[in-house]
Each structure stands twice: as C-alpha cells, then as structure tokens.
C-alpha cells in the first residue's frame, strides 16, 4: 500500500493531493497513522514539519521506498505550473545521472556565466533551524568558520536568512514552528565581490554556480557533484562543467500535471 502523508497545512496540502491522484491505490493519512501501518510499500511526504519528518525517518529505518517532496530547485512553485522537487529515498537529488537537456531548456530561468576567479569575499550560508534539527548539525556554523579561518585569510561574511522559524517538537515528536528568529536578515549577496559560497544544503549553491561563483557544500546539497565538500580546500575551488548536473536536476522536479498524470513517478521509478 502507498501512503501519502498529510501536511496539515493549506498551502502545501495540494501537492499531497496531486500525489494521491497520480499514484493508483494510494491513501492519504496523518503522519502518526502511517508510521503505525504494517502494509506500507511506499510512502510520500512533503517537507519535514508537522510530523512529516517522522514518516521520512520511519521509512528510511525500515527500508521502505519513500518519495520526498519540497520546493523546487528552480521554477514557479506557488502558482501554475506548480513545480515541486520529488526525490526517491533522499532529501534532495545530490547525485548526477545522465539526462537529456530538454527539461532544462524548457524551464531553466538563468543564464550560465563563465566561472569567476577574481572574487574576494567568502559568503557562508548556514542551514535553517529546521535543517539543523533534521540533520543534527547545530554546530555546523561554528565548525565551518573554524575550518575556514584555519585555511584562508580572505574576508568571511555570514549571511543570515530573512525567514528562519524556531523549531520545536509536538507531543508526537513532530517538528513544529514555535517562534520567530529575530536575527535581522543580511543584505543581498554582492556577487561581483564574491569568491565562493560555503553552505550546507541551501539552494543558494545553484544560483551561485550559474553566476560562476564556486561552491563548498555538504554532501546533502544538490550541487555537491560540482562543488568541493572539503572546506579545508577553500583556496582550491572546483571549476567543473555544470550543465550536465542541471540537466539531471531538471529530471528531479515536476509540475502539478506531471504529479497527477503519473509521469513524475514513472521517471523516479526508472520506468
């Protein structure tokens, strides 16, 4: 049986309903109900809040195939055509698979600039509070700054998110928003003066690489295949071919129609 987890949030429940529509014999349940089932063969969830992360970890632990949905790598997500990334058995698509360029050419919004090698500032983009909880990386920023300072004399700028809710847990252990982080947001990135972006799993890596700014990321990042994951190598960035990875990423996000007509699931299952 395929179980699809409710998000209990009006803005995101439509993605769940589209998944149910596109997956024959699937059923929508509350997260706490899914993890009690005995006949689950596949699970689907959107995001990690309001109990959905419990389904993710439960499926992972029990070796049940799961499909994780979230905001896309690029494209309109809150209006038609409603792009959403969908990843089988992972949080994001952090690997490369050979794909044609058709979906990329149809939807990619940015020009791809040549690699830029004359920047000055290192811009550090920490994981959100939700991602710190989900991946257990509360000390990521401290560890990252320590490594960078030991290996470079370049200026290091830490970019704070404009929206970064404080995360707690409900009585079932699901992540919930418990407050607001009042840290003021940082100014926009000065791309002309940027030497490199250092981040955990943020999608800023995609924009940066299209602008020709090299990235240093954790393995839990969609641009990890074209980024350096060893932060001690901050003075030797990777300048590698980008387009094939973007083609691959384009086959990891889908429209509402593609969720509903089954195309997304057939691609993810290799059919």
Map each language-model feature to its residues:
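Conserved catalytic-core segment of nucleotide-activated headgroup transferases in glycan assembly
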Residues: 117-170
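N-terminal pre-catalytic "stem/leader" segment of glycosyltransferase-like enzymes
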Residues: 1-42, 53, 130-131, 266-271
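Generic beta-sheet signal
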Residues: 46, 68-70, 159, 200, ...
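Leloir-type glycosyltransferase catalytic cores
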Residues: 78-119, 225-271
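Structural motif
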Residues: 4-10, 41-42, 44-50, 70-71, 121, 125-128, 195-196, ...
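Donor nucleotide-activated moiety binding/catalytic core segment of transferases
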Residues: 30-37, 51, 149, 154-215
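Extended catalytic core of nucleotide-activated donor transferases of GT-like folds
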Residues: 14, 27-79
């Amino acid at each position: 049986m395929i179980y699809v987890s409710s998000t209990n949030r009006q803005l995101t429940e439509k993605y769940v309903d589209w998944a149910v529509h596109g997956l024959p014999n699937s059923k929508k349940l509350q997260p706490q109900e899914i993890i009690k089932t005995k006949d689950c063969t596949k699970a689907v969830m959107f995001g990690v809040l309001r109990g959905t992360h419990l389904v993710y970890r439960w499926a992972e632990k029990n070796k049940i195939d799961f499909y994780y949905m979230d905001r896309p790598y690029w494209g309109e997500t809150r209006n038609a055509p409603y792009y959403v990334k969908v990843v089988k058995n992972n949080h994001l698509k952090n690997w490369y698979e050979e794909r044609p360029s058709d979906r990329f050419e149809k939807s990619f919004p940015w020009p791809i600039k040549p690699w830029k090698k004359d920047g000055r500032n290192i811009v550090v983009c920490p994981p959100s509070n939700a991602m710190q909880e989900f991946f257990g990386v509360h000390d990521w920023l401290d560890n990252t700054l320590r490594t960078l300072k030991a290996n470079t004399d370049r200026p290091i700028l830490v970019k704070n998110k404009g929206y970064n809710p404080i995360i707690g847990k409900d009585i079932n252990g699901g992540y919930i928003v418990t407050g607001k982080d009042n840290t003021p947001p940082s100014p926009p990135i000065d791309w002309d003066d940027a030497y490199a972006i250092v981040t955990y799993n943020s999608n800023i890596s995609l924009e940066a690489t299209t602008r020709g700014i090299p990235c240093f990321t954790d393995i839990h990042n969609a641009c990890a295949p074209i980024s350096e994951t060893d932060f001690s190598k901050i003075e030797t960035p990777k300048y590698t071919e980008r387009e094939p990875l973007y083609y691959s990423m384009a086959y990891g996000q889908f429209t509402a129609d593609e969720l509903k007509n089954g195309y997304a699931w057939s691609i993810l299952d290799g059919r």
